[in-house]
Regions:
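Conserved catalytic-core surface of thiol
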Residues: 369-436
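Catalytic nucleophile-His microenvironment captured as a short glycine-rich beta-strand/loop
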Residues: 69, 147, 351, 356-384
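Active-site nucleophile-adjacent alpha helix/oxyanion-hole segment immediately C-terminal to the catalytic cysteine
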Residues: 44-309, 380, 387-390, 397, ...
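Short His-Asn-centered micro-motif
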Residues: 72, 311-314, 364
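N-terminal regions that are enriched for targeting/export leaders
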Residues: 2-58
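Long, positively charged binding patches that form subdomain-scale interaction surfaces
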Residues: 282-358
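Short, glycine-/Ser/Thr-/acidic-enriched flexible segments
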Residues: 76, 316-318, 366-368, 384, ...
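Generic recognition of flexible, low-complexity loop/linker segments
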Residues: 285, 295-301, 348-353, 362-369, ...
Length: 436
């Protein structure tokens, strides 16, 4: 391997000293936030305006300083059904209620994987994946599992706490506890002893800690509200499951996660099964890998049908948070830092860890150009009303093609050929083989 030499440094210095533009850029960056300078107002302005197709939604939510975007997006789809059923202008489901059970399920899954793989080497790829511990993050299928098992409740029944809005310290504390528990469980299994009496005690500790941080989940509640005509309604002693069945009633298994991840290990037109990615023990995440054009076509169909779309993208790529825009032409960090290029094919970008799905939101609209093709997309974010257009964002078609990786589609919009693909044998990918 070659190290940096004095000759090399001299050449680098001479190259920079001869570049007057680079020195001007340094002067600007020395005193100004890079995000302010990277944004190109003229390019961003072309993304403003109404949308050809737009789905009405009931306002912006705020996940605060937590990583629960995936759950907010899922519940924001469900709340539209409640609002329609009850004739409400505004409504929100409790994110805290399901977040509690998400943490509990992730802790249980962690301990079960430790027990199941107790003979695996501690420094092996599998155990190092397990020992990453829990996070706030998740996917559509994890939200579905939680909703089907635990139901949902209105936000006023289990409101946010400071800890549910600021989860970092709780997650750090739980991971320290779980890693200590992992050490003990591995030692018990390796000594030929039953680990489950100790696991029960460990789960009780996690449950108590989660109750202290987030509040103990309700088992039943009364639902009282006034509809848009000011008529009073009340139903007593509802369980979260009964509330879901009566006021939401969606068959969530009719929705399919469609991904566009054109990597060497994920063939297109093929179901992909991500082993051990789920929050619940023994569950795998499944998705159908389609071309970008097919994914986009399904999104347009669903929006035209009046249905918002849960989707996942790389929120760190070409984003202007304050302006509420994702667009390579509008956010030019490369030009600001000397004019280099980060262009890579979409599949290679994933393979080289240059990009991944980091944020989930809702697609709620699309605008078509003069040829009838999408050129910008409306997004309902969960970052509150102080950013974007009162909390709504927009992304360009260029961004959508390169940095949108997943969309959840009602199977009614699939072609017969696409439905048949769901019956194919899936390609199985272990979570520890990729960055999940």
């Amino acid at each position: 391997m070659k190290e940096i030499t004095n000759d090399m440094l001299a050449q680098l210095r001479a190259s920079y000293d001869a570049d007057g533009q680079a020195q001007v850029l340094h002067s600007a960056l020395a005193k100004t936030d890079m995000a302010e300078l990277a944004y190109v107002p003229g390019a961003g302005a072309r993304l403003k305006g109404a949308f050809s197709v737009e789905v009405k939604t009931r306002g912006i939510t705020a996940q605060q300083k937590s990583g629960r975007c995936w759950l907010f997006a899922a519940l924001n789809i469900l709340r539209e059904k409640v609002a329609e059923t009850c004739h409400l202008d505004q409504f929100e489901l409790s994110q805290n209620y399901l977040s509690f059970y998400d943490k509990l399920e992730k802790a249980n899954n962690f301990l079960e994987m430790v027990i199941e793989n107790a003979q695996e080497p501690i420094k092996g790829q599998l155990m190092q994946y397990v020992l990453r511990g829990m996070t706030d993050g998740g996917y559509w299928s994890e939200a579905v599992d939680l909703i089907e098992k635990y139901g949902v409740v209105p936000k006023q029944v289990q409101p946010e706490t400071y800890q549910s809005n600021h989860t970092d310290r709780f997650v750090v504390a739980m991971n320290r506890l779980l890693r200590k528990d992992a050490m003990e469980l591995r030692e018990l299994v390796q000594a030929g002893k039953d680990p489950y009496p100790r696991k029960a005690v460990m789960m009780a500790e996690v449950y108590k800690a989660a109750c202290i941080a987030f509040g103990q989940p309700v088992q039943s509640f009364d639902f009282a509200y006034r509809d848009k005509e000011n008529n009073y309604h009340e139903e007593r002693d509802l369980t979260p499951q009964a509330f879901y069945q009566k006021y939401v009633g969606l068959s969530l298994r009719d929705y399919v996660a469609v991904i566009n991840e054109p990597t060497a290990d994920k063939p297109l037109d093929t179901p992909i099964q991500f082993h051990a990615v789920e929050n619940m023990a023994g569950r795998d995440m499944k998705a159908l890998n389609l071309s970008q054009a097919a994914l986009e076509d399904l999104c347009v169909k669903q929006l035209k049908h009046g249905q918002a779309i849960w989707f996942a993208c790389d929120a760190g790529a070409f984003g202007a948070r304050k302006e509420g825009i994702w667009d390579p032409a509008s956010v030019q960090y490369e030009a600001l830092l000397g004019g280099f290029s980060t262009d890579m094919p979409k599949g290679k970008r994933l393979e080289y860890n240059s990009s991944s799905a980091t944020h989930a939101m809702l697609l709620t609209g699309v605008h078509f150009d003069k040829d009838g093709q999408p050129d910008r997309w409306k997004i309902e974010n969960s970052w509150g009303k102080d950013v974007g257009d009162q909390g709504y964002f927009v992304c360009s078609e260029a961004y959508f093609k390169e940095f949108v990786y997943e969309a959840v589609i009602d199977r009614r919009h699939f072609s017969p050929e696409q439905l048949a693909l769901l019956e194919k044998e899936p390609v199985v990918i272990n979570a520890w083989d990729e960055d999940y």
